[in-house]
């Protein structure tokens, strides 16, 4: 038996969490740190995210996939942007669709995943797992978007510029797009066509001049990557936002120094959404000495816990 190796592998005992009344979220997370499995990973994510946000030299990327805005996560993200904790946001079109719906005063409603979907269809109600919204919301959204598109400059625009203009036309401090436009934080959506915002842009373009270059954002995005002294990313889910962020480092001399992934996807099928951050190291996307962790849990549970704990630590600096 190699007693030296055994001593190394048996150096950190699992410490049972102790829960007491009136604990803060950060105190709870510190108890998680002594635990294994998902609890230990979440505590590690808090440590990494704190270091990433506290660093004065790290460019902070945020990947937003899934249905985070209809689930109620938009305030958290808007506040992170407002307080300077997101430098670059990459998102799916759907998240910005539902952000805009809310910004127009149109609500999402708590429903049930056990609904009769045929009945919901007859009632003109759309379902996103256990969230409902009426079809009429999309009619109102479409009217708003058509008005925005009609006021766009008659020149070649990037998708980022289109999203900025949408944000400028919103009046809701909880809006991700409005906050990003006010703070000068770029919002990139490489697959905007895969959303109502993109669909309405195409419909408008069928009868009106609208010039959007789907590749125009690449140069600007790569300039940000090249200019980053250090880079870190928080990835909610996978898909296009995750890959768009991570692949950017393939054309720069560096890799991500910090990376956190909150996901429910599995790696066994070989898809990007479930790919581990360790796998990303083989591509050079995440650095050899990077601080990284994947937390396998619902992002609507883990993101609020992580952000709350990190904000507590940041307030004590």
From Swiss-Prot:
Keywords on record = Hypusine biosynthesis, NAD, Transferase
Q: Write out the pathway annotation from the protein's UniProt entry.
A: Protein modification; eIF5A hypusination
**Entry cofactors:** NAD(+)
Top-level EC class, please?
A: transferase
Molecular function (Gene Ontology), one example: deoxyhypusine synthase activity
- Residue numbers annotated as active site: 285 (nucleophile)
Q: What is its EC number?
A: 2.5.1.46
- UniProt cross-references to Pfam families, sorted A to Z: DS
Can you state which reaction this protein catalyses? [eIF5A protein]-L-lysine + spermidine = [eIF5A protein]-deoxyhypusine + propane-1,3-diamine
| GO CC terms in record | cytoplasm
For whether the record's keyword set contains Transferase, the answer is yes
Q: Where does the sequence pass through the membrane? A: none
To which protein family does this belong?
Answer: Belongs to the deoxyhypusine synthase family.
Task: Please give the function described in this protein's UniProt entry.
Answer: Catalyzes the NAD-dependent oxidative cleavage of spermidine and the subsequent transfer of the butylamine moiety of spermidine to the epsilon-amino group of a specific lysine residue of the eIF-5A precursor protein to form the intermediate deoxyhypusine residue.
Which protein, by its recorded name, is this? Probable deoxyhypusine synthase 1
Q: Which organism is it from?
A: Methanosarcina mazei (strain ATCC BAA-159 / DSM 3647 / Goe1 / Go1 / JCM 11833 / OCM 88)
């Amino acid at each position: 038996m190699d007693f030296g190796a055994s001593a190394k592998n048996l150096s950190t005992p699992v410490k049972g969490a102790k829960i007491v009344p009136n604990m803060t979220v950060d105190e709870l997370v510190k108890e998680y740190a002594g635990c294994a499995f998902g609890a230990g990973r979440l505590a590690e994510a808090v440590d990494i995210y704190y270091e990433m946000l506290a660093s004065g030299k790290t460019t902070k990327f945020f990947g937003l996939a899934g249905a985070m805005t209809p689930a109620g996560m938009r305030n958290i993200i808007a506040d992170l942007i407002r307080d300077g904790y997101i430098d670059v946001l990459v998102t799916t079109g759907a998240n910005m669709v539902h952000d805009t719906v809310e910004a127009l005063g149109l609500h999402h409603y708590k429903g049930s995943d056990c609904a009769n979907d045929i009945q919901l269809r007859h009632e003109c109600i759309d379902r996103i797992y256990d969230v409902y919204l009426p079809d009429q919301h999309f009619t109102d959204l479409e009217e708003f978007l058509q008005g925005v598109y009609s006021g766009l400059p008659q020149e070649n625009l990037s998708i980022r510029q289109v999203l900025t203009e949408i944000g400028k036309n919103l009046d809701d401090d909880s809006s991700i797009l409005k906050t990003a436009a006010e703070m000068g934080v770029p919002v990139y959506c490489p697959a905007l066509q895969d959303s109502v915002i993109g669909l309405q842009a195409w419909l408008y373009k069928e009868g009106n001049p609208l010039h959007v270059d789907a590749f125009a954002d690449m140069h600007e995005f790569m300039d940000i990557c090249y200019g980053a002294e250090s880079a870190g990313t928080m990835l909610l889910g996978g898909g296009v936002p995750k890959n768009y962020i991570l692949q950017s480092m393939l054309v720069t001399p560096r890799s991500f120094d910090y990376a956190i992934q909150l996901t429910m996807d599995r790696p066994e099928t070989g898809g990007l959404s479930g790919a581990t951050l360790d796998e990303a190291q083989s591509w050079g996307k995440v650095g050899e000495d990077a601080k990284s962790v994947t937390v396998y849990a619902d992002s609507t549970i883990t993101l609020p816990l992580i952000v709350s704990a990190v904000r507590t630590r940041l307030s004590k600096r």
